[in-house]
Amino acid sequence: MAPSEDIPSSEQRHQKIQARILSLKKQISFSKWWTALFFLISLGAAVNFRFLPPISENVRQFLGISPSSTLISIALIVYAFSALILILGRMNTASVHFHGWSHIGYLSAFYLFYYYSGTLRDNFWAVFIAGLTILSLENYRVWSVCSETIKKEEKTLAFLDK
């Protein structure tokens, strides 16, 4: 193999960097879309999921008695603090990937638990504020890391263009 085959050309490096920049911009965009999905789910929860059929007695018997609102709230608090600690820990790793999809699943489950227990109207704001806090911090983390990396990549492009 000739030495020139091991070293990518200037144009290849340029294209690779541009592809990385595009990928980072997509990560920022994905994080916004996931947050929009949470808002849509929250809209459904705000109207007590009126568009869903009522839970039948057979399903209620199969699922059993719902946990009390207090237990669900304790679980929400534990989850929210755990999620925030994990996000803050990821801030140090400089990972550019958005991890909010799992948060949306958990937060949706809390809406459903409150819905099943019949206390969604009383606890909607607790889930919404927890979700808004968690997803906002995750969005900030992704935006911060991606923006910093994009600036570095753009500096590299400027250096290659000289």
Residue ranges and their predicted role:
Residues 1-31, 156-162:
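N-terminal juxtamembrane cytosolic/stromal segments of multi-pass membrane proteins
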Residues 2-7, 80-85, 144-147:
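Membrane-water interface of transmembrane alpha-helices
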Residues 31, 69-78, 126-133:
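Alpha-helical transmembrane segments of polytopic membrane proteins
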Residues 35-73:
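Hydrophobic transmembrane helix segments
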Residues 38-44, 77-84, 132-139:
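Hydrophobic alpha-helical transmembrane segments of multipass integral membrane proteins
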Residues 49-59, 85-91, 112-122:
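Juxtamembrane "helix-exit" motif on the non-cytosolic side of transmembrane helices
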Residues 76-112:
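Loop-to-transmembrane helix junctions at the membrane interface
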Residues 118-162:
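Terminal transmembrane helical module of multi-pass membrane proteins
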